[in-house]
Amino acid sequence: MAEGWLMNPSDKWTYRFHRDEKSWVRDQKVFVDMGRPMPDGSPALLKTRQHLRREDAEKFWKNLLSYGWQRVPAVWGADAEF
């Protein structure tokens, strides 16, 4: 898991899953940020950040997909397409 994005199509809340590079070698952890893109193009509204073990993050990802969340390209940050 390098980085991935999931969005709830009904309300546009989005999860960003990305590695914690500082812990990746010894104890693989993932940051999971929840936010929503702003319609006027201003910075995203970030609500929460979780710090999960890689296995837990993968389970969470699969669970969200089973509830209808969809993979999307980057929604905010340097990789986002505007």
PLM features per residue range, with description:
Residues M1-F82:
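Terminus-proximal functional modules
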